[in-house]
């Protein structure tokens, strides 16, 4: 049950961090450059998107702390790395971001995903029955 909580928390952290990245990108691309702040009124939707993205990062951190409570760091961190793939796919798929797919980006993201799968497959196969630093229930 604790491992399931860890996986759910890590997944929540990954999804929230991905949403935060997309929200920051969308909001910041619609705000004026800092040197123009004095002369322009910022778009409210963009400010709201940035504020929500910061909140999503905070929630992602809380999920991350919960994940670390129940999962080995290598396992949790590899899942968090999958957020790169999710952000890339969404940013290139959604017209609001004006991003594109490319062979080199897709290959790089594919390697990240392959790494996540490799790390988790090896750890599952070689997982010890008892972690030495934890007491048996």
From Swiss-Prot:
One GO biological-process annotation of the entry reads:
lipid A biosynthetic process
Gene Ontology terms for molecular function: carbohydrate derivative transmembrane transporter activity
Q: Where is the signal peptide?
A: none
Membrane topology annotation? Multi-pass membrane protein
Where does this protein reside within or beyond the cell? Cell inner membrane
| Record-level GO cellular component terms | plasma membrane
What ranges does the Cytoplasmic topological domain annotation cover? Answer: 1-3, 66-76, 122-137
Report keywords, A-Z: Cell inner membrane, Cell membrane, Lipid A biosynthesis, Lipid biosynthesis, Lipid metabolism, Lipopolysaccharide biosynthesis, Membrane, Transmembrane, Transmembrane helix, Transport
Does the entry feature the keyword Ribonucleoprotein, yes or no?
no
InterPro entries reported for this sequence:
Flippase_ArnF, Small_drug/metabolite_transptr
Q: Which residues lie on this side of the membrane: Periplasmic?
A: 25-44, 98-100
The record's similarity note reads: Belongs to the ArnF family.
What NCBIfam families does the database record attribute to this sequence?
PRK02971.1-2
Subunit note = Heterodimer of ArnE and ArnF.
**Record function comment:** Translocates 4-amino-4-deoxy-L-arabinose-phosphoundecaprenol (alpha-L-Ara4N-phosphoundecaprenol) from the cytoplasmic to the periplasmic side of the inner membrane.
Q: What is this protein called?
A: Probable 4-amino-4-deoxy-L-arabinose-phosphoundecaprenol flippase subunit ArnF
């Amino acid at each position: 049950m604790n491992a399931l909580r860890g996986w759910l928390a890590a997944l929540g952290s990954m999804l929230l961090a991905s949403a935060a990245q997309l929200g920051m990108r969308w909001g910041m691309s619609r705000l004026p450059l800092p040197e123009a702040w004095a002369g322009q009124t910022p778009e409210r939707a963009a400010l709201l998107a940035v504020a929500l993205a910061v909140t999503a990062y905070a929630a992602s951190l809380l999920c991350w702390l919960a994940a670390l409570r129940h999962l080995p760091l290598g396992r949790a961190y590899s899942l968090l790395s999958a957020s790169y793939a999710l952000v890339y796919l969404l940013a290139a798929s959604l017209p609001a971001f004006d991003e594109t797919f490319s062979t080199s980006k897709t290959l790089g993201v594919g390697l990240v995903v392959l790494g996540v799968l490799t790390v988790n497959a090896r750890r599952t196969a070689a997982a010890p029955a008892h972690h030495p630093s934890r007491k048996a229930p």
